[in-house]
Amino acid sequence: MKFELDTTDGRARRGRLIFDRGTVETPAFMPVGTYGTVKGMTPEEVRATGADILLGNTFHLWLRPGEEIMRKHGDLHDFMNWQRPILTDSGGFQVFSLGDIRKITEEGVHFRSPINGEKIFLDPEKSMQIQDSLGSDVVMIFDECTPYPATHDEARKSMQMSLRWAKRSRDEFDRLENPNSLFGIIQGGVFEDLRDESVKGLLDIGFDGYAVGGLAVGEPKADMHRILEHVCPQIPADKPRYLMGVGKPEDLVEGVRRGVDMFDCVMPTRNARNGHLFTSEGVIKIRNARHRDDTATLDPKCDCYTCKNYSRAYLYHLDRCNEILGARLNTIHNLRYYQMLMEGLRGAIETGTLDAFVKEFYTSFGREVPELIV
């Protein structure tokens, strides 16, 4: 992977990630394909929304279908027929989400399979091996996602173990002679001194890119913004910056303003299945009865297949009847909305008009622009 930085506007960055399987324009949003599919979508449909790269889930793909079946197909690209870049998370966040059915030790994590209750062990070495079998273009280190709230001491212990796991991930990745890219994950909760220690430790190990983890786990938005403003300038300018698991459209805007290059989130797809649709004027809840006879399109500014062909009344009807097509059309729209937002942000950075773009974005929702600390 090669990262090219073209231009900046304030702290916002316009660039691209160049892989053997294709180029990803940044800032970029990655749709989430947890089980090797963006729910309800074919790869061609996902690509048509403007997506350059997908995120796959190491933890779930390890449990089903497993490494053996994956290797029989070649890798995840061949298995799901997506011949463009794929980033896979390490499984750390999913283990974090298991709560009481997992036990974290220095060696790794013991837990019971959420599928059949089988006892399973996952550690940094195994995570690297699984991601190697997936053929991931971007591999994420195995880390512990620091919970929120956490005391300074709890966050420190978690972050320092993640640093030790980062070194083990790096060593195993190198032992496997994996030709792809490995990203480190910055932890430390909401504590700036711990984030500093994490950044320094990861830079000493050396990675191809750096993610900011442990955010969007319940902390106030002000804390997320503060940590991003503190951490992003410490990441070398020639390395991509990835904000994991984020988020709402305004979170992407605020992340870009603070220098983030990459995002992922299940929100556009999950919300689509629940009838929450993002538009240039705010969220439309298509299940609201007011849309029963509404002949308007979802968003006159959107060029997606759904907006070009169907009315709000039709989408309301499909949802009321629990038709699969409704969820698919909603997903196409939400994914395209996110990609159009990223296209707009990239264009604004290129032309030096990001402030105006951000102001218009918030004005359309009747909201004030959040202040940057610096």
UniProtKB/Swiss-Prot annotation:
Substrate binds at residues 89-93, 143, 187, 214. Zn(2+) binds at residues 302, 304, 307, 333. HAMAP family: Q_tRNA_Tgt. It is an enzyme of class 2 (transferase). GO terms for cellular component: cytosol. The gene is tgt. Belongs to the queuine tRNA-ribosyltransferase family. It comes from the Bacteria. NCBIfam families: Q_tRNA_tgt, tgt_general. Coiled coil: none annotated. Pfam families: TGT. Catalyzes the base-exchange of a guanine (G) residue with the queuine precursor 7-aminomethyl-7-deazaguanine (PreQ1) at position 34 (anticodon wobble position) in tRNAs with GU(N) anticodons (tRNA-Asp, -Asn, -His and -Tyr). Catalysis occurs through a double-displacement mechanism. The nucleophile active site attacks the C1' of nucleotide 34 to detach the guanine base from the RNA, forming a covalent enzyme-RNA intermediate. The proton acceptor active site deprotonates the incoming PreQ1, allowing a nucleophilic attack on the C1' of the ribose to form the product. Homodimer. Within each dimer, one monomer is responsible for RNA recognition and catalysis, while the other monomer binds to the replacement base PreQ1. The active site is at 89 (proton acceptor), 264 (nucleophile). Its cofactor is Zn(2+). This is Queuine tRNA-ribosyltransferase. Binds 1 zinc ion per subunit. Gene3D superfamilies: Queuine tRNA-ribosyltransferase-like (3.20.20.105). It catalyses: 7-aminomethyl-7-carbaguanine + guanosine(34) in tRNA = 7-aminomethyl-7-carbaguanosine(34) in tRNA + guanine. GO terms for molecular function: metal ion binding; tRNA-guanosine(34) queuine transglycosylase activity. Residues 245-251, 269-273 are annotated as: RNA binding.
